[in-house]
């Protein structure tokens, strides 16, 4: 049997053992808890002195400092260039994490290896030392087990009832001398032969400190037992939790303590309360402290240190891949820590709603409590809703949280006035101020699906909050009080109103205040870029007056965009030096991320698809543009007789065509205005992707006009120079609708012939929307749906008719796409584009 097979068998046995033990513990624990009166447990909790709780929590947080001695020993043995203060802070964070999700200490060992490898050359020796620390967690218990075996601690009651525990103690006790001998004979470092002994002593003291915390929990709930008997039960329970591989020993440890104290005659309600206090003081409080430390210890400085460390040499292949993510993970620790703290804060104060309700029921001034409860609940819900925003380092989310903290503080001060909780709120407020200064974005994009999700989540939380309060009051027999005039009346609707007011005010403030932050480059810079590097089919629209421009730092490339509904909608591909497009888009996306905007590209070509893909985008085919090859275009031949017939008809009617160069006279503009108004027929002009009838815009390029025999303008089209590939396009095409003549055909034919005479080789006839989209059953569902719209909704919009009309000119069809972020909705993105096009 080779080593690989042995390892697999061992892993299977370990998982089977842990699973079986977990099931056994869960069933037994459920059986024991089912007989407990939880109302009595709550009554016992209400009797606890608050100062005793404060001392307990301080002791629980301080007890974990002992574990930092492991890291002090480690840093001194390996002669690490790291300050004692940093060792203590980092160690505290590691140990708090390990206590919650320890899996027998393996999580802590992994984090230690990740952190300390940047401070030493000898990685192999580091791993050896960390392994020694991992094993010493058991040797401390082994030393304490020896004290039970030699009857220093009295465990006779539990050993008489559960005889197999005695053999476990013997085995664990025997492990200590083996470990000490082995660690001295084969030490990680020959100059530090007693490291194993030192770690064992640290482990022993730490377990005793944990035992003292639990014992103090028993004292404050009035569960008096002999310390010697208590410590014996604790050691056996700790062994059970450690070998179970369950994070924190949850379940296994608690079951043994519950059974052990039951044999000593302590009521189960008091034991349960004692365990809850112990879990909070020894696990939850250190985690809170660790999260606070993480907010300051890790982040940008840590990331820079790792990148600049002489010991940080990226490995190849998999190691390099993992290390590339490690730096980013460390940089996110502060915001993640604060987000977790805010989440726990909101949960704790949601529970405190019960205290306000309880006090209100026995107070005559219901109205005051009614308002304070609604404010308190609203603030708690706002805290909860902004947890993700705090993690994403959004200033708007942090401001929401800060206002919520202030509102909770006011409600707390005027109701149950817990100075412990007010102090905690002050700490969180300070952390939020620090986070606000570090925040790298003003706000996150507002998306419709997120709004709907937040509304549903809010309703769910408020419903759960109501069920919790009602259920607790019912369990405590408080519903015997008349409640139709109590604080719960109309509470839900007032809460919704307060939330709406706060959200509305802050959202308006950000949109109003930071709308001024949006920058726009000068149009002269864009003109210079186009003159130097060329344009595209849409570049002439820089003169339409409804766009803003964003250039790169060197002013060699730009894009044109417009803001709408928390989005920056970009028209077409970037323009300018193609080598600068990467830099341009990165700067633009950074700019949009800082302001909390989405980025949408409209009508882009397939030329730069890889570039857009690099920024996490996906694509939707909008349709195809008809590009006519003027070198092949002709009105001669049998197939083109329709073109000749159209031109001959206009000649017979003495309708002429000419190109008018700017500047234009007022009389000429008035003639065009008359035609345009009749053509629009009170319809609203479109914007953004097309030009509008505007004298300033029209004066930037020649205009083709058709005149009748009275020399009156009956149709016109505005030219769109492209400044690249000898191509040209037209924008506005308008005619007198009362004339029963093919004026659009006439304009196109005359423009095609004129463009060919002027030496142009390509003519853009515009896009056929949804043309050739989703034609294969392999296409995305959204594109197949768009294809069905193209085929079956021709009555609403002439999708097929537009393509058929342009097809008679035998164009080459080039695809055009919508580019949007992969986590955005297609339909919401399309909706924003349509709003930009249809509204100025």
Swiss-Prot record:
Coiled coil: none annotated. It catalyses: L-lysyl-tRNA(Lys) + a 1,2-diacyl-sn-glycero-3-phospho-(1'-sn-glycerol) = a 1,2-diacyl-sn-glycero-3-phospho-1'-(3'-O-L-lysyl)-sn-glycerol + tRNA(Lys). Residues 1-8, 74-89, 150-161, 222-229, 293-337, 391-394, 437-450, 511-840 are cytoplasmic. It holds the Pfam family LPG_synthase_C. It is a multi-pass membrane protein. Keywords: Antibiotic resistance, Cell membrane, Lipid metabolism, Membrane, Transferase, Transmembrane, Transmembrane helix, Virulence. InterPro entries: Acyl_CoA_acyltransferase, L-PG_synthase/AglD, LPG_synthase_C, PG_lysyltransferase. GO terms for molecular function: phosphatidylglycerol lysyltransferase activity. Its EC number is 2.3.2.3. One of its GO terms (cellular component) is plasma membrane. It comes from the Bacteria. Catalyzes the transfer of a lysyl group from L-lysyl-tRNA(Lys) to membrane-bound phosphatidylglycerol (PG), which produces lysylphosphatidylglycerol (LPG), a major component of the bacterial membrane with a positive net charge. LPG synthesis contributes to bacterial virulence as it is involved in the resistance mechanism against cationic antimicrobial peptides (CAMP) produces by the host's immune system (defensins, cathelicidins) and by the competing microorganisms (bacteriocins). This is Phosphatidylglycerol lysyltransferase. It comes from Staphylococcus aureus (strain N315).
């Amino acid at each position: 049997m080779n080593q690989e097979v042995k390892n697999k068998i061992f892993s299977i046995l370990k998982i089977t053992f842990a699973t079986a033990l977990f099931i056994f513990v869960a069933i037994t624990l459920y059986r024991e808890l089912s007989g407990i009166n939880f109302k009595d447990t709550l009554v016992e909790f209400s009797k606890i002195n608050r100062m005793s709780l404060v001392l307990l929590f301080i002791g629980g947080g301080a007890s974990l400092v002992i574990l930092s001695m492991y890291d002090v020993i480690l840093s001194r043995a390996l002669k690490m260039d790291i300050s004692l203060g940093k060792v203590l802070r980092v160690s505290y964070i590691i140990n708090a994490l390990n206590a919650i999700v320890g899996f027998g200490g393996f999580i802590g060992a992994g984090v230690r290896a990740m952190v300390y490898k940047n401070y030493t050359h000898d990685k192999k020796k580091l791993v050896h030392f960390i392994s020694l620390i991992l094993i010493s967690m058991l040797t401390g218990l082994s030393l304490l087990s020896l004290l039970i075996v030699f009857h220093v601690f009295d465990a006779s009651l539990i050993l008489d009832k559960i005889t197999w525990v005695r053999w476990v103690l013997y085995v664990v006790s025997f492990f200590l001398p083996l470990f000490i001998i082995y660690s001295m004979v084969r030490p990680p470092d020959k100059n530090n032969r007693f490291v194993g002994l030192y770690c064992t002593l640290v482990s022993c003291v730490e377990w005793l400190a944990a035992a003292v915390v639990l014992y103090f929990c028993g004292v404050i709930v009035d569960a008096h037992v002999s310390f010697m008997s208590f410590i014996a039960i604790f050691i056996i329970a700790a062994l059970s939790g450690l070998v179970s591989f369950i994070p924190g020993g949850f379940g296994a440890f608690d079951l043994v303590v519950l059974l052990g104290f039951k044999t000593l005659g302590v009521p189960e309600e008091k034991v349960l309360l004692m365990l809850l206090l112990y879990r909070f003081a020894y696990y939850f409080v250190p985690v809170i402290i660790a999260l606070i430390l993480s907010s300051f210890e890790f982040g940008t400085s840590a990331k820079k240190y790792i990148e600049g460390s002489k010991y940080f040499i990226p490995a190849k292949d998999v190691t390099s891949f993992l290390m590339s993510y490690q730096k980013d993970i460390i940089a996110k620790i502060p915001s993640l820590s604060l987000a977790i703290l805010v989440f726990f804060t909101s949960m704790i104060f949601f529970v405190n709603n019960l205290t306000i309700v309880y006090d209100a029921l026995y107070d005559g001034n219901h109205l005051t409590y009614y308002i304070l409860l609604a404010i308190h609940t609203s603030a708690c819900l706002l805290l909860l809703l902004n947890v993700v925003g705090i993690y994403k380092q959004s200033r708007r989310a942090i401001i929401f949280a800060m206002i919520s903290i202030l509102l909770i503080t006011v409600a707390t001060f005027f109701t149950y006035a817990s100075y412990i909780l007010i102090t905690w709120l002050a700490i969180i407020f300070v952390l939020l101020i620090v986070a606000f200064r570090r925040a790298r974005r003003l706000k996150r994009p507002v998306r419709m699906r997120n709004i709907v999700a937040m509304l549903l989540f809010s309703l769910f939380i408020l419903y759960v909050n109501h069920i919790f309060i009602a259920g607790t009051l019912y369990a405590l027999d408080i519903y015997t009080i008349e409640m139709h005039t109590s604080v719960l009346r109309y509470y839900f609707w007032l809460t919704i109103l307060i939330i709406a007011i706060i959200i509305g005010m802050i959202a308006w403030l950000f949109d109003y205040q930071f709308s001024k932050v949006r920058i726009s480059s000068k149009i002269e810079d864009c003109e210079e870029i186009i003159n130097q590097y060329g344009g595209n089919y849409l570049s002439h629209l820089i003169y339409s007056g409804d766009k803003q421009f964003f250039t790169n730092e060197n002013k060699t490339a730009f894009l044109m965009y417009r803001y709408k509904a928390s989005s920056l909608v970009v028209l077409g591909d970037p323009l300018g030096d193609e080598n600068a497009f990467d830099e341009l888009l990165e700067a633009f996306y950074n700019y949009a991320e800082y302001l909390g905007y989405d980025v949408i590209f409209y009508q882009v070509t397939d030329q730069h698809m890889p570039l857009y893909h690099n920024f996490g985008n996906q694509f939707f085919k909008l349709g195809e543009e008809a590009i006519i090859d003027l070198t092949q275009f002709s009105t001669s031949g049998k197939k083109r007789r329709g073109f000749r017939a159209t031109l001959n008809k206009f000649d017979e009617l003495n309708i002429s065509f000419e190109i008018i160069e700017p500047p234009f006279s007022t009389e000429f503009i008035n003639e065009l205005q008359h035609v345009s108004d009749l053509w629009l027929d009170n319809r609203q002009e479109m914007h953004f992707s097309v030009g509008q009838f505007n004298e300033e815009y029209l004066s930037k390029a020649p205009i083709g006009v058709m005149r009748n025999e009275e020399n009156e303008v009956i149709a016109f089209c505005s030219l769109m120079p492209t400044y690249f590939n000898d191509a040209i396009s037209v924008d506005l095409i308008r005619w007198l609708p009362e004339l029963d003549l093919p004026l659009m055909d006439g304009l196109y034919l005359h423009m095609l012939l004129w463009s060919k005479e002027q030496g142009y080789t390509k003519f853009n006839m515009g896009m056929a929307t949804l043309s050739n989209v989703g034609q294969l059953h392999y296409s995305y569902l959204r594109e197949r749906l768009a294809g069905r719209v193209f085929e079956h909704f021709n009555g609403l919009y002439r999708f097929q008719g537009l393509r058929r009309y342009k097809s008679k000119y035998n164009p080459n069809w080039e695809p055009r796409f919508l580019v949007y972020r992969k986590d955005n909705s297609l339909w919401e993105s399309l909706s924003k584009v349509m709003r930009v096009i249809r509204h100025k």
